[in-house]
Design a protein with these regions (language model features):
Chain B
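Conserved strand-helix element at the start of the C-terminal RecA-like helicase core
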Residues: 117-125, 135, 140-155, 282-286, ...
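Conserved segment of the helicase C-terminal RecA-like domain
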Residues: 226-241, 389-420
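Conserved helicase ATPase core of P-loop NTP-dependent helicases/translocases
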Residues: 153, 168-179, 328-356
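Conserved RecA-like helicase motor core of SF1/SF2 enzymes
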Residues: 205-208, 342, 346-351, 355-399, ...
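Inter-Walker segment of RecA-like/P-loop motor cores
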Residues: 159-194, 341
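Post-DEXD/H (motif II) to motif III coupling segment of the RecA-like Helicase ATP-binding lobe
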Residues: 196-272
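N-terminal pre-P-loop "Q-motif" helix
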Residues: 89-112
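Interdomain "pre-motor" coupling segment immediately N-terminal to P-loop NTPase/helicase cores
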Residues: 27-80
């Protein structure tokens, strides 16, 4: 008998004839069915650029204002359920909750075409307090390259505490790691981040990666 | 930081304070990690990268890892002993209440662990007042806690009016920061932040969720109390465990089997119904339940109908509508209009309320009858059933009313609930209680 990592309720493994026939240990899901049902993935119609959930399939207002052809894919809408999840996982630092999203990230990455996977890094200060990078926590065994670095001086306070205008004005926080020049040239890079809010962070990261010689950059985020 | 913040507490700090004793927040015992705040074992998968363990049990109070340190300064009781009683409460206790209050005061003075077993609607809070006044006058540090935050929120202004001492109110998202006070009102979760701090701990609704089923919180209550301290449990429905302690004389007990108006508790009647669950699946309700509700409709009697689960609410309402009974509303814990609906029922704007166990305790409606659908469901514990029965007849003008439980069988929980009500009524009759 195990409990759901998210809500703590009991989870009982489903026993079917097939599981009995294979005579393998019963695999209990880490997340209960109720929590699984609360997570509702994004569905059509979406903005073709940033994957925002909307009523039409036209390019959304924010993407028009950006004026570029950035393509972002996302898995979930950033609704109350995802906010609660991010609150517990990222801000309270419950690293165990990474297993909730691992299957979703695995399936989403399998659908993407890319050469190099680059997760958005966290600052050294965040590493000290949080103790983990929330993005790489979702990766199970997918290879990734940490070609970006970020320092605390550029992030005096977290993005999530700023207004939209402040976020859009924020300066470039990323640098290329020394190893980048060997990895990036002529590669299709996929950036992985937790939430796409204004798109500012991802575009900052992409600008640096293009400088490193990549031929294309797209992104995947857990939530939009 | 003011050092009084650490008196009798157990706080994780980034920097070591000038005074105080620090211990690692997580300790390794025989290869397993144990959290020093909540005393729970760390799960085998609860690690950060680089194999740093962290505690998921008390995560809500701020994450503790093996790198965190907890600081404490032993409780010094820096309160002046008062020359006169801090009790400013002007109310009058009934003769029965006064006898109970005297008994509680005597046991407190003797430093005994005790239980005040008073029926629902007996006025437990006020019975504790004389003993609390005595303790505060002696310069004791006292915590008045409850597992339920709404109890704490309701209690804090009452205690502020009744006692002229500074008080700190602590709960999940409290607006005011912690201060060192002789009287602390908090949820039982907040007690995890204290260590050997209180001379006297009062636990209100000791049998309520989640304290009754949580070893973590039960330990928190014991650890927040000083080794020389004592505790007072307040409840109308002590669980099996507390009743065992009473039988073994490990816990002193004061009974108050009569309500403030002097009438006995209405008995719990059981009516057997065949398979109410499958009837509900077909959007039907047991015939005798429907007849009862119809009768209430004709006489204008208001009723509470308790159902086991949130998902039953809509089905029961549809079944009632199909049977031609209108005027009922449903309410559950996550209902955004919960307060408004309960208020509408209180003001007699609706005739019936279909509810889950959220209204089992802490609410008073004048002149209601109570129906319980599926009293054999696991949700209805003995304590829940007695509490639900206690919603009836709380007022002097309407001391009686029906409490009818519809169940497929007489389960042990139902029998225990009936036995508890009967035992309290036997004691009450000896004290001159009248049948309503």
């Amino acid at each position: 008998m195990t409990t759901c990592v998210w809500c703590g309720r009991m989870v009982t493994p489903t026993v079917t004839l097939a599981t009995l026939w294979h005579w393998q240990p019963l695999s209990t899901p880490a997340v209960c069915a109720a929590c699984q049902n609360r997570l509702q993935p994004l569905h059509a119609p979406q903005c073709p650029r940033c994957a925002r959930q909307q009523t039409t399939t036209q390019v959304c207002h924010d993407c028009v204002r950006w004026g570029d052809a950035w393509v972002n894919h996302a898995i979930f809408p950033y609704d109350a359920v995802l906010k609660a999840y991010m609150q517990q996982y990222k801000f309270q630092g419950d690293y165990r909750l990474r297993v909730v999203m691992q299957p979703y990230i695995r399936r989403a990455l399998a659908r993407e075409t890319y050469d190099v996977l680059v997760p958005i890094p966290v600052t050294a200060g965040t590493w000290l307090t949080r103790g983990f990078n929330q993005v790489t926590g979702w990766l199970t065994d997918q290879p990734f390259q940490q070609v970006l670095t970020v320092d605390d001086a550029h992030k005096p306070r977290p993005q999530s505490s700023k207004t939209r205008q402040e976020r859009l004005r924020s300066p470039q926080p990323f640098q290329l790691a020394p190893a980048a020049e060997k990895i990036l040239p002529n590669q299709h890079v996929l950036l992985l981040d937790d939430v796409y809010t204004t798109g500012r962070t991802l575009r900052h990261a992409a600008a640096q990666i293009y400088l490193g010689g990549a031929k294309a950059v797209t992104s995947l985020t857990l939530a939009r | 930081m003011d050092k009084s913040q650490l008196f009798g507490r157990r706080l994780p700090l980034d920097q070591a304070p000038p005074e105080g004793h620090g211990i690692p927040a997580l300790r390794q015992v025989n290869g397993r990690w144990q959290c020093q705040r909540c005393q729970q074992w760390i799960g085998v998968n609860d690690y950060l990268p680089h194999r740093i363990p962290y505690c998921r049990h008390c995560l809500n109070l701020g994450r503790l890892t093996s790198h965190t340190k907890l600081y404490t300064i032993p409780e010094p009781n820096q309160f002046a002993t008062l020359t006169h009683s801090p009790l400013t409460w002007q109310g009058q206790l009934s003769p029965q209440q006064r006898i109970a209050a005297q008994a509680v005061l005597r046991l407190t003075q003797a430093g005994r662990n005790q239980l005040l077993w008073a029926v629902t609607g007996a006025g437990k809070t006020e019975i504790g007042f004389p003993a609390l006044a005595w303790a505060l006058q002696r310069g004791w540090r006292v915590a008045w806690t409850s597992p339920r935050v709404d109890v704490c929120l309701e209690l804090a202004p009452r205690l502020a009016r009744a006692f002229a001492v500074p008080q700190a109110v602590l709960y999940g998202d409290q607006p005011r920061p912690y201060t060192y006070c002789p009287l602390t009102i908090c949820t039982t979760h907040q007690l995890l932040r204290f260590e050997a701090a209180f001379d006297w701990v009062i636990v209100d609704e000791v049998d309520a969720f989640p304290l009754a089923t949580s070893p973590l919180l039960q330990l928190a209550v014991r650890r927040a109390q000083k080794p020389t301290g004592s505790h007072l449990y307040l409840t109308a429905t002590p669980g099996q465990d507390l009743q065992r302690q009473i039988r073994r004389h490990q816990l002193a007990v004061t009974y108050l089997p009569l309500r403030h108006h002097g009438y006995l508790l209405p008995p719990l009647r059981v009516k057997l119904v065949a398979n109410w669950q499958s009837q509900l699946d077909q959007q039907r309700l047991p015939g005798n339940l429907l007849r009862q509700v119809r009768q209430y409709q004709q006489t204008g009697q208001r009723y509470l109908l308790f159902v086991p689960h949130v998902k039953d609410l809509a089905r029961v309402q549809q079944a009632l509508r199909r049977a031609g009974i209108e005027g009922g509303v449903t309410v559950h814990a996550a209902d955004p209009q919960r307060q408004a609906k309960v208020q509408a029922f209180r003001e007699r704007r609706v005739s019936g309320l279909v509810t889950t166990t959220i209204l089992e305790r802490g609410v008073t409606f004048p002149a209601v009858c109570v129906l319980i659908l599926g009293g054999d469901d696991l949700v209805f514990s003995t304590a829940a059933l007695v509490q639900i029965a206690g919603r009836v007849g709380r007022q002097r003008d309407h001391p009686g009313g029906d409490v009818i439980c519809y169940a497929t069988s007489q389960t042990r929980t139902i029998q225990r609930a009936q036995a508890m009500i009967n035992a309290l009524n036997r004691r009450g009759r000896r004290l001159g209680g009248r049948c309503p």
